[in-house]
């Protein structure tokens, strides 16, 4: 073996050696045809065609004529390729059935790479042909002349549906080829997209296995290929940044050799996330996921309090206060670099919401309690708060409509979809390994498929879907009233405790006076106004979509992607829109002592837009 990095491009056999442009090689597999040959659409004289050409073009009658005249279907041509190979690579299912009925050997080896027809079909990505050949007993575990089985070829060429089908039919997700390469390693090296790597990871593939010769992990191979998409997936799945190959090189070392700044930064961040580059006492805390989560949730509590507390201090020197604010900023920077991880995008907004409401309630009970009427103000405020806490808790912790399936159900679904010609990534989720119901979507934040997906809300730390959308609407409604009461409390406090001259000196003088009178109260007021704006806008948008359009936020944003929506430049026509009144009754499931009969849908199992579904799997009148 060579000593330098270039050895990875000079190894023989089924070791990564092809350049990216050779992934679809113009080789013996397609016999010079750039794409699988289509059927002839014009009248032609097929009577002079030999059986190989007729097979390539799918001329069934000519092929049958020659076979009936005595041609041996097992006989290879001058290039050692059988008719079954040519039918397989050009996806001629009817001819495959015919040739096998006439005695063709389904696993006969042929061609320069000594491959089976199943290998040829796999390389070209013909899932329907793979299914058909395996129905006739083709063995996907057989290796070709390069030492690869079908799952390795499918992973190399990015045929995700075929990878899924082969695994569902029993192929080992960690199967090694003759050179010790797993499907994950091939996908990491050859396929610069999320799939099939994401699919393999979902099947609990061994992320940190090393290949037979170089001892490179999938992360090593992704770095060698500059596959940034897959690098991110592997790191999220627990890829070991410090794993070393036979030369003692880590993935980070290889990235530095290639001087790829993006890869170097991300691999170093992965090390830091595990606490490897921190002092020992910080490393232990950094490695504690629960502690990191508490820090991310708790930081907003500290920051909101310190901002108001420093402003409220009876200190005339703004220099001192400025230095104190600088200390707050430095503390936040330290915490963020030491303990914040990729989950901060969901943890921080939730922490900000919880912290804001906590300090608002502290302000209400310690500043407003003695100034406001109990019956007319405090009692309604407390009742509203109970409803707010209930709906927030349900929005935060309840199941938003996660589509669940057992391992066996997932594999069964894959096989059923493949064998019916429906294993399309537009209706199949390669992460959750389920058939996606209508109106569902895979949430990239939660990494789950959600029924009737609306959006992922960072303010409640959860997706909003079929299971909690009504609670989310209740949360917005009662939150808006809570904020209005808070603003009312601030204004009342200023009227009772602050000397103001609004009518005499105008608005800006009034702002200065109330900010000086109680900086803490002014800080709470600013928070209230900020939250009022986004809550009011979100509530109005949600109500408009629910009542007038009959669609979710996801559907409104991506309507052009869904065939069942009719989209113009000015409107979206939804098959789920039944008029404002009907939409409201169905969404909130209003019954009013039997006056209304809402239509209840199990969106986790609804795969079509038709409404005449039986109870438990579709629309149901109550």
From Swiss-Prot:
GO molecular function, one term: protein-cysteine S-stearoyltransferase activity
SUPFAM superfamilies to which the protein is assigned, alphabetical: Ankyrin repeat (SSF48403)
Start-end of each ANK repeat: 41-76, 79-108, 113-142, 146-175, 179-209, 214-243, 247-276
Residue ranges annotated as Lumenal topological domain: 337-347, 393-470, 527-529
Location in the cell: Golgi apparatus membrane; Cytoplasmic vesicle membrane; Presynaptic cell membrane
Post-translational events: Autopalmitoylated. Autopalmitoylation has a regulatory role in ZDHHC17-mediated Mg(2+) transport.
Active site annotation, chain numbering: 457 (s-palmitoyl cysteine intermediate)
Main location: Golgi
InterPro entries per record: Ankyrin_rpt, Ankyrin_rpt-contain_sf, Palmitoyltrfase_DHHC
EC primary class: transferase
Membrane topology: Multi-pass membrane protein
Keywords: Acyltransferase, ANK repeat, Cell membrane, Cell projection, Cytoplasmic vesicle, Golgi apparatus, Lipoprotein, Membrane, Palmitate, Repeat, Synapse, Transferase, Transmembrane, Transmembrane helix
Cellular compartments per GO CC: cell projection; glutamatergic synapse; Golgi apparatus; Golgi membrane; Golgi-associated vesicle membrane; perforant pathway to dendrate granule cell synapse; postsynaptic Golgi apparatus; presynaptic membrane
Residue numbers spanned by region Necessary and sufficient for interaction with DNAJC5 and SNAP25: 1-295
Domain DHHC: 427-477
Reaction catalysed by this enzyme: L-cysteinyl-[protein] + hexadecanoyl-CoA = S-hexadecanoyl-L-cysteinyl-[protein] + CoA; L-cysteinyl-[protein] + tetradecanoyl-CoA = S-tetradecanoyl-L-cysteinyl-[protein] + CoA; L-cysteinyl-[protein] + octadecanoyl-CoA = S-octadecanoyl-L-cysteinyl-[protein] + CoA
One of the protein's GO biological processes: regulation of programmed cell death
UniProt KW Repeat keyword: yes
Stored PANTHER family: ANK_REP_REGION DOMAIN-CONTAINING PROTEIN-RELATED (PTHR24161), PALMITOYLTRANSFERASE ZDHHC17 (PTHR24161:SF18)
Function per UniProt: Palmitoyltransferase that catalyzes the addition of palmitate onto various protein substrates and is involved in a variety of cellular processes. Has no stringent fatty acid selectivity and in addition to palmitate can also transfer onto target proteins myristate from tetradecanoyl-CoA and stearate from octadecanoyl-CoA. Palmitoyltransferase specific for a subset of neuronal proteins, including SNAP25, DLG4/PSD95, GAD2, SYT1 and HTT. Also palmitoylates neuronal protein GPM6A as well as SPRED1 and SPRED3.
Subunit structure: Interacts (via ANK repeats) with numerous proteins (via the consensus sequence motif [VIAP]-[VIT]-x-x-Q-P). Interacts (via ANK repeats) with CLIP3. Interacts (via ANK repeats) with HTT. Interacts (via ANK repeats) with DNAJC5 (via C-terminus). Interacts (via ANK repeats) with MAP6. Interacts (via ANK repeats) with SNAP23. Interacts (via ANK repeats) with SNAP25. Interacts (via ANK repeats) with EVL. Interacts with SPRED1 and SPRED3. Interacts with GPM6A and OPTN. May interact (via ANK repeats) with SPRED2. May interact with NTRK1; may regulate its localization and function.
Family label: Belongs to the DHHC palmitoyltransferase family. AKR/ZDHHC17 subfamily.
Protein name: Palmitoyltransferase ZDHHC17
Organism: Rattus norvegicus (Rat)
